[in-house]
């Protein structure tokens, strides 16, 4: 359940009864310190100013009218008019009982929306590199979160599968008499790409043939289309290996490459001209946007068709948004693309809105992210200055985790050891990224991400194993916990209340696309459990009622940690 929403509703009703306008905001927040209660309502000051009242006087009136019977044990006014709410422990205990047995930990069902999430987007005929990591894992965390809440999520992998480079690649494959492209690994294609580019730059006859193949490919020539399809299939098969290793939910069925929108592009250019939005300028077709100015202070021109008839990324992105609304029926469209593309997207979407392709009621959201940097504060590279391949990064993560885990578990069976090492290594890379605000750059540091303390995947995975080990030692499962839950100690109350805030957290992540909020919550939860575990006897509690009650708190902690980590795509293990 969403306690914040419940209290906001109750406080808003009291504010309105006290004379506040119907659109007043209660501003209910989780309290930062225990002395200020579990929640604070901070909206009184703003409302008092509108009403010309003393905030304290309005706060007193609101508290008189505030009906939190059975929910709060105490309501206090602090400072100029803050309202501190202390939850009733019996009420908290009942809600924990409900969360333990309810579907989805008691998180309320949402009104399902169709939400398209654009993420990952690697290029064909190139291996995935570290630059693809953030979009892939942040986007997948958003997808998992939205799906958990009950939304209809459409994963859109906007693969770079079109352009002049394909003429070059097809021509080079032919030159090498290598028409059986399906037998080639992606590493061969990487080399082919480099050699094809070199030949294209140096051999005029070859470059003419490559350009001819581009025209043939675009006009539907069967041989060229078959070769192009092979290049796409080989690339995506290799990318699927990376997705599976990363525990990412993307599959080949989610590929919606640039080529998907080819047929729409001429229609869009014609339509934008017909609507008076696009004009001819020096042979090209341009949309001038008053919302953006060039260096001379004039409306910026956005080219949607070059004078040679070619289309641009902007044209494709306009078609893409239109397709996602009209064909996929999107209620909301999210783009996990790095921050450097922000102006490009905003310009495309401005045209989309002006043309009426996607109504204002359907949000187009750029959930941008910063760069992954090395310890030197520069873009993360190999020692020789090259781009780090994603597969190499994951190999190193597993290798480093292997040394850490094998050393601590010399007697663990080989199969289990391999699974734990993989979960910890891959989890460490993902969590290090997801635990940072996506809008900022972050420093990639092996030592920090594999540490067994602090806000890291290994610590979180270990925290989970510590909780489940309680049940192994107790020799009980959920069905044997039949006595009611009671909350008497402060540490029990703090842990129980934090457990009940899971819905507030996951709702925030779903709304804002901020997985670091979930990471912070889970880290806090693990710390609260550790304090509870150290100060409140569980297995040796003074009575069977308290023993079972504390086991129930431990059970919900385990379930919440596991579910929270799952929304991030981080695997848990039963022991480390």
Swiss-Prot record:
Q: Which GO terms describe its molecular function?
A: arginine-tRNA ligase activity; ATP binding
SUPFAM superfamilies reported for this sequence = Anticodon-binding domain of a subclass of class I aminoacyl-tRNA synthetases, Arginyl-tRNA synthetase (ArgRS), N-terminal 'additional' domain, Nucleotidylyl transferase
InterPro entries listed in its UniProt record: aa-tRNA-synth_I_CS (IPR001412), Arg-tRNA-ligase (IPR001278), Arg-tRNA-synth_N (IPR005148), Arg-tRNA-synth_N_sf (IPR036695), ArgRS_core (IPR035684), DALR_anticod-bd (IPR008909), Rossmann-like_a/b/a_fold (IPR014729), tRNAsynth_Ia_anticodon-bd (IPR009080)
Domain of life per record: Bacteria
E.C. code: 6.1.1.19
List, alphabetically, the CDD domains matched.
Anticodon_Ia_Arg, ArgRS_core
GO BP: arginyl-tRNA aminoacylation
Gene Ontology CC: cytoplasm
User: What Gene3D superfamilies would the database entry show?
Assistant: Arginyl tRNA synthetase N-terminal domain, HUPs, Isoleucyl-tRNA Synthetase, Domain 1
What catalytic activity does the UniProt entry give for this protein?
Answer: tRNA(Arg) + L-arginine + ATP = L-arginyl-tRNA(Arg) + AMP + diphosphate
Q: Which UniProt keywords apply?
A: Aminoacyl-tRNA synthetase, ATP-binding, Cytoplasm, Ligase, Nucleotide-binding, Protein biosynthesis
Instruction: Report the subcellular localization.
Output: Cytoplasm
Q: Main localisation, per the record?
A: cytoplasm
The motif 'HIGH' region: which residues?
A: 122-132
Q: Which NCBIfam families match?
A: argS
In the record, the note on similarity to other proteins reads: Belongs to the class-I aminoacyl-tRNA synthetase family.
Q: How does it assemble?
A: Monomer.
Q: Which PANTHER family match?
A: ARGININE--TRNA LIGASE, CYTOPLASMIC, ARGINYL-TRNA SYNTHETASE
The protein's name is Arginine--tRNA ligase
- Recorded source organism is Yersinia pestis bv. Antiqua (strain Nepal516)
């Amino acid at each position: 359940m969403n306690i914040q929403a419940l209290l906001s509703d109750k406080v808003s009703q009291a504010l309105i009864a006290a004379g506040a306008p119907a659109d007043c905001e209660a501003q209910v927040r989780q309290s930062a310190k225990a002395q200020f209660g579990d929640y604070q309502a901070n909206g009184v000051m703003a409302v008092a100013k509108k009403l010309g009242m003393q905030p304290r006087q309005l706060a007193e009136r609101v508290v008189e009218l505030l009906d939190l019977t059975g929910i709060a044990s105490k309501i206090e006014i602090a400072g100029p008019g803050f309202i501190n709410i202390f939850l009733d422990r019996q009420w908290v205990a009942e809600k924990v009982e409900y969360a333990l047995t309810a579907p989805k930990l008691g998180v309320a069902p949402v009104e399902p929306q169709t939400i398209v999430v654009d993420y990952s987007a690697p290029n064909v005929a190139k291996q995935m590199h570290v630059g693809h990591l953030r979009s892939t894992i942040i986007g997948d965390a958003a997808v998992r979160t939205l799906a958990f809440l009950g939304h209809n999520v459409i994963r859109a992998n906007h693969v770079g599968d079109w352009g002049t480079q394909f003429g070059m690649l097809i021509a080079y494959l032919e030159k090498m008499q290598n028409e059986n492209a399906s037998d080639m690994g992606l590493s061969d294609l990487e080399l082919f790409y480099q050699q094809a580019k070199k030949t294209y730059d140096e051999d005029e006859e070859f470059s003419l043939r490559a350009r001819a193949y581009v025209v043939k490919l675009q006009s539907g020539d069967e041989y060229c289309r078959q070769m192009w399809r092979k290049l796409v299939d080989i690339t995506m098969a290799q990318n699927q290996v990376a997705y599976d290793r990363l525990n990412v939910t993307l599959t080949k069925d989610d590929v919606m490459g640039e080529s998907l929108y080819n047929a729409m592009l001429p229609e869009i250019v014609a339509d934008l001209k017909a609507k008076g939005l696009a004009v001819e300028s020096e042979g090209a077709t341009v949309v001038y946007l008053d919302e953006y100015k060039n260096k001379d202070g004039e409306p910026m021109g956005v080219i949607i068709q070059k004078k040679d008839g070619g289309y641009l990324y902007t044209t494709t992105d306009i078609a893409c948004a239109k397709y996602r609304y009209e064909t996929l029926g999107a209620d909301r469209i999210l783009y996990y693309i790095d921050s450097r593309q922000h102006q490009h997207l905003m310009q495309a979407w401005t045209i989309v809105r002006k043309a009426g392709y996607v109504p204002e009621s359907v949000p187009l959201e750029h959930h941008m992210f910063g760069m992954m940097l090395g310890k030197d504060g520069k873009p993360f590279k190999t020692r020789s200055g090259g781009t780090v391949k994603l597969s190499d990064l994951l190999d190193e993560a597993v290798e480093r985790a292997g040394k850490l885990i094998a050393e601590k578990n010399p007697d663990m069976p080989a199969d289990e050891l391999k699974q734990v090492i993989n979960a910890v290594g891959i989890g460490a890379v993902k969590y290090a990224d997801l635990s940072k605000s996506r809008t900022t750059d972050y420093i990639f540091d092996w030592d920090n991400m594999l540490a067994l303390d602090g806000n890291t995947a290994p610590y979180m995975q270990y925290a989970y194993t510590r909780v489940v080990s309680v049940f192994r030692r107790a020799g009980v499962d959920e069905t044997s916990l039949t006595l009611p839950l009671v909350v008497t100690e402060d540490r029990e109350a703090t842990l129980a209340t934090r457990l009940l805030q899971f819905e507030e957290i996951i709702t925030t992540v779903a709304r804002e696309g901020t997985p670091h909020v979930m990471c912070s919550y889970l880290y806090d939860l693990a710390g609260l459990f550790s304090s509870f575990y150290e100060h409140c006897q569980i297995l040796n509690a003074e009575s069977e009622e308290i023993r079972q009650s504390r086991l129930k708190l431990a059970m919900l902690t385990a379930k919440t940690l596991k579910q929270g980590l799952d929304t991030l795509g981080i695997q848990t293990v039963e022991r480390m």
